[in-house]
Each structure stands twice: as structure tokens, then as C-alpha cells.
Amino acid sequence: MDILKKSLFLVLFLGLVSLSICEEEKRENEDEEKQDDEQSEMKRAMWKDVLKKIGTVALHAGKAALGAVADTISQGEQ
């Protein structure tokens, strides 16, 4: 009976240790995923700002080019 108790205790102890290790790894993986999500959101926000600025610059450049063409045409008509 004593051997049975010791072996049962050993099995339970090893089970708890492996469960603890698995939970720790799970927490680490969740933390890594959370960090990856935060980095992805930061990159998305950065690209959104960059593309907005590029669009604004392109809009102003297009307006300036159209103005120059209109000036050239009006000077040619005179």
C-alpha cells in the first residue's frame, strides 16, 4: 500500500509540473501574440499616415500642373 501511495504521489506531482510548464508556455505565446498584434496595428497606422501624406502631395502637384497648363494655354491664346 505504501508503494502505491508513493507512485500515485509521484504521478500527481509530475502531472502538476507538466501542467504548470504548459500554462507558462501558453502565457508566453499569448504575450507574444499580443505584442505582434500591437506592432501590426502600429505599422498599419504608420502606413495610413504615409499614404495620406502622399495623396495630399500628389493632389497639390496635380493642381499645380493643371494650373501651369492652363497658364500656358491662356498665354498661347493671347
Curated annotation (Swiss-Prot):
**Similarity section:** Belongs to the frog skin active peptide (FSAP) family. Dermaseptin subfamily.
Q: Which residues form a coiled coil?
A: none
GO BP of this protein: defense response to bacterium; defense response to fungus; killing of cells of another organism
UniProt entry keywords in alphabetical sequence = Amidation, Amphibian defense peptide, Antibiotic, Antimicrobial, Cleavage on pair of basic residues, Fungicide, Secreted, Signal
Name of the protein described by the UniProt record:
Dermaseptin-B1
Residues that the record marks as modified (Glutamine amide) are Q75
Q: Which GO terms describe its cellular component?
A: extracellular region
**Where is it localised?**
Secreted
- Tell me the disulfide pairings in this chain: none
Q: What residue ranges constitute the propeptide? A: 23-42, 76-78
Q: Name one Pfam family in it.
A: DD_K
Q: Where is the major localization of this protein? A: secreted
Q: Give tissue specificity per the record.
A: Expressed by the skin glands.
Q: Which organism is it from?
A: Phyllomedusa bicolor
Which InterPro entries does the record match to this protein? Dermaseptin_dom, Frog_antimicrobial_propeptide, FSAP
Q: Where is the signal peptide?
A: 1-22
* Chain's role: Possesses a potent antimicrobial activity against bacteria, fungi and protozoa. Probably acts by disturbing membrane functions with its amphipathic structure.
